[in-house]
Amino acid sequence: KYYVMALGTGLSLTPIYNELQKRCEAKQLSFRNVVAFNAYEYYPIAKESSLKSINQLKERFLDHIDIDPQNIFTLDGSVAQDAVQDTCRLYEQRIKTFGGLDVTILGIGRMGNIAANEPGSSIQSLTRIILIGNMSREEMENSFKTKEQVPPCSLTMGVGTLLTAKTVFLTAWGDEKSEIMQKVIEGNITDTLPATFLQTHPNAQVVLDLSAAAHLTRIEHPW
C-alpha cells in the first residue's frame, strides 16, 4: 500500500522538507512508496511556467528525495475554464484511488487560510476553483515579481479533502503568525478562519516556534 501525502508549498514548510530530505539522503527514510498530491495550483497559469506551485514544491523538496516522479500529482492550472470542474473532480477521485490521504502537511496564511482555502471556505469543501484574496495575493508576491502577476484564482484541495487525512500537520514560525495562531488554536471554530477547522480533527498537530506561540495562553500567561 502507498503512503499518500497532501503537501503545501508555503515557505514555513521549508525546514520540514529540509529535514525529511536529510533523512532520505542518510537512508533513514525512503519515499519510494509515497504518493504526493500538491495541495493547490495557481489558475490560470501556463503549463511551461516556472512559477507553478508544483515547481516550487519540486525545487524545495520532491526533486531531492527518492520518490517516483510518476507518483507526484498536481492540479493542472492550464486547463480551459470549462474543464476546471472535471479537473477538480478527477483529483478527488485519484486521491480515493490510492486509498485516501495518510497525512496532510500545511503552512498557514495571514488570514487563517490553509492551502488556498480563503476565509468563507466550508469544512465540507472539496477540490475546486477559488478566487485569491488580496492578503493572499500579497503573500504570493514572494513567488511572483509583482502582486499584479499573481493569477486571479487557485485550484485547491478543499478543507474537507485535506481533513480526510489520518494526520494533519500545520506549521507556523515567527511573530507575524502569533496572533492568527492564537485564534486558530484557542478561538472559536469559524469559516472566517479556515484553519480553525483543524480543531475538529482527531489527530491534528500544530508545530510552532516560540515566537509564533507567543500569544497562546500557556506561553503568555503561564501562571
Region roles according to the model:
Residues 157-160, 164-223:
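ATP/nucleoside-binding phosphotransfer catalytic cores, i.e., glycine-rich phosphate-binding loops
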Residues 28-103:
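Ligand-binding beta-strand-loop-alpha-helix segment within the catalytic cores
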